[in-house]
A protein has these predicted regions:
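A short acidic, often aromatic-flanked loop/helix-cap motif at beta-alpha or helix-coil junctions
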Residues: 27-28, 147-152
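Conserved lysine of the Walker
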Residues: 4
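Conserved substrate/cofactor phosphate-moiety recognition/catalytic segment
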Residues: 9-52
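Glycine-rich phosphate-binding loop used to anchor ATP phosphates in small-molecule kinases
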Residues: 42-93, 100, 108
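Short, glycine/charged-enriched secondary-structure capping and boundary segments
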Residues: 11, 34-35, 76-79, 112-116, ...
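Walker A (P-loop) phosphate-binding loop of P-loop NTPases
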Residues: 1
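Catalytic phosphate/metal-binding cores of nucleic-acid and nucleotide-processing enzymes, i.e., regions
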Residues: 31, 61, 163
Length: 176
């Protein structure tokens, strides 16, 4: 439990931005059982559909609860492997900014999660997310703290990214 889903909704509200749900959570909730390796490809396809539907609306900012990197990482974490077509697509569809939620919140079991999620398992998953995102050249900002401070940390990261992006566009416009 990193507070990612709650944070996604709060950020979308703060920035008046469209947001996506977590395809794996939705998929498994519909199935009513734990995820299996045979579910990875349908989850990935659903994730792509969710992203593509959201991206078509012309907004300047989108908040995704997860993307294909989550599918890749959890598949490796749970099953030790992932279908080969997913990783190249992760890189091709890489988001502009990733907020990596810390594991500093108290763990709360939900029906989606596999295992007991011991502190060591949570740290391993967090480290795997950090290394895969970094290895794939993703722009990553850490988000930690509790409650409103966590939200403010995330808002600050996005505002900084937006201002840097706007400044880069302005410099490009000036040089043309």
């Amino acid at each position: 439990c990193t507070g990612k889903t709650v944070l996604t909704r709060a950020l979308a509200e703060n920035f008046d931005a469209p947001f996506s749900t977590e395809s794996a959570r939705d998929f498994v909730s519909e199935l009513g059982r734990a995820v299996q390796f045979s579910d990875v490809e349908p989850i990935a396809r659903r994730q792509i559909e969710i992203e593509d539907a959201l991206l078509g609306d012309g907004s300047r900012l989108y908040i995704f609860d997860t993307d294909l990197f989550s599918t890749l990482i959890y598949s490796r974490l749970y099953f030790g492997r992932c279908p080969g077509w997913i990783e190249p697509l992760c890189r091709a569809r890489r988001a502009d900014l990733y907020l990596l939620c810390g594991i500093d919140l108290p763990w709360v079991k939900d029906d989606f999660q596999r295992g007991r999620s011991t502190p060591m398992e949570r740290q391993h998953a967090h480290s795997l997310f950090a290394s895969v995102l970094n290895e794939n050249g993703c722009s990553v900002r850490a988000v930690s703290e509790l409650n409103d401070n966590r939200l403010q940390c995330a808002i600050s990261a996005i505002e900084t990214w937006l201002s840097n992006r706007t400044a880069a566009v302005d410099r490009t416009s000036e040089s043309s």
